[in-house]
Amino acid sequence: MVTEVSLIEIAKTTRQAAQKSAVLSTEAKNQAIEAVAQALEKATPKIITANQLDCRIAETDGIAKPLYNRLKMDEAKLNSAIEGLRNVATLRDPIGVVQIHRELDAGLILKRITCPLGVIGVVFEARPDAVIQISALAIKSGNGVILKGGKEATNSCLELVTAIRQGLSTTSVNPDGVQLLTTREETLELLKLDEYVDLIIPRGSNSFVKFVQENTQIPVLGHAEGICHVYVDKFADIQKAVKITIDAKTQYPAACNAAETLLVHTDVAAKFLSEVFPELEKRQVELRGDRATQQILSSVKEATDLDWATEYSDLVLSVKVVDSLDSAIAHINNYGSGHTDAIITEDGKAAEIFLAQIGSAGVFHNCSTRFSDGFRYGFGAEVGISTQKMPPRGPVGLEGLVTYKYQIVGDGHIAATYSGENAKPFTHQDF
């Protein structure tokens, strides 16, 4: 009960801080972001040391390789996160944007204007860099944020949030707008605070995200899986296809936008697979193929139905030979997770059909699935990826942390004037 009460107080404090941030100028918020960046740079040795401790403990506990890769934060990864933080300051302020400005009648003016959501709860496995990304977006969008990292990242998150709050202490943004929880019990209680928390963003494994979705009444923004596909069409440029496949699978295999299944048209299967296989083998990628693939690459393990529905997050790639574009589309729409899928082809009509018929949040032509990322989209950073059909969808940056309200300003106007036998008509003129 003590934990529940204290967490409610934390949520209330976060909301109070967020209410003040909601009215800050763009300049004040950008100054706060720069102060945080400088504080993180100053705290780099402490952050790296804390992360090394987390990594040693995680190795002792036998953490899975994909989680370990997400947990590890060297100086280059930290500097990249700080760069992303600063990029958020250069983005357009999403708050106070007038989406509708309309005269309903003389002296009766309607506006629809963007505003912060309020308090966001973010729960994540490993991924200490998520602390920096999400804090930056929360500051810029005038929201408060309650962060809960996995136990494997506890020391890293503590140092990161300490530095962030230290940076904010010299600015107009109240440090109480960024809070950190550290126990599993607090996670469960956070999911129950629908009265105080406006949005939950989970970042982690399939089972983790599903657990969050099934245990809260708070709206959830997230995706459970990242089963991404690359389809090499019969009209593909083979060299492009090899280069893109290597990048999509190996550039960062633990990422949710890494390719997990490779589909190859039967007309180019022998040529393409014979060229891409040595490159994948050189990078220690394990292939699991259907029988048609095994006839071309005899050393490849046999794929099962489970492979087509698996997010490996590792150097494993399932391969299937298909007889048509329609077959590739059907496979992706059946087994895919709605994250990101790509077609490699020089046939514009085939690309057009693929882009239209694949139902994923990201559908690409002649480029790697790894481009499905908020930073690469120019969002500055992302709070997560959403594969749901309703917006926000795909990599979610500032726009996913903003809602809107309707404001009407009148001068003694009453609704009765516009109803009944002698009702006055509305003018409905947009400014």
From Swiss-Prot:
Keywords: Amino-acid biosynthesis, Cytoplasm, NADP, Oxidoreductase, Proline biosynthesis. Catalyzes the NADPH-dependent reduction of L-glutamate 5-phosphate into L-glutamate 5-semialdehyde and phosphate. The product spontaneously undergoes cyclization to form 1-pyrroline-5-carboxylate. This is Gamma-glutamyl phosphate reductase. One of its GO terms (cellular component) is cytoplasm. The gene is proA. The keyword Oxidoreductase applies. Belongs to the gamma-glutamyl phosphate reductase family. GO terms for molecular function: glutamate-5-semialdehyde dehydrogenase activity; NADP binding. PROSITE patterns: PROA (PS01223). Transmembrane segments: none annotated. It comes from Trichodesmium erythraeum (strain IMS101). SUPFAM superfamilies: ALDH-like (SSF53720).
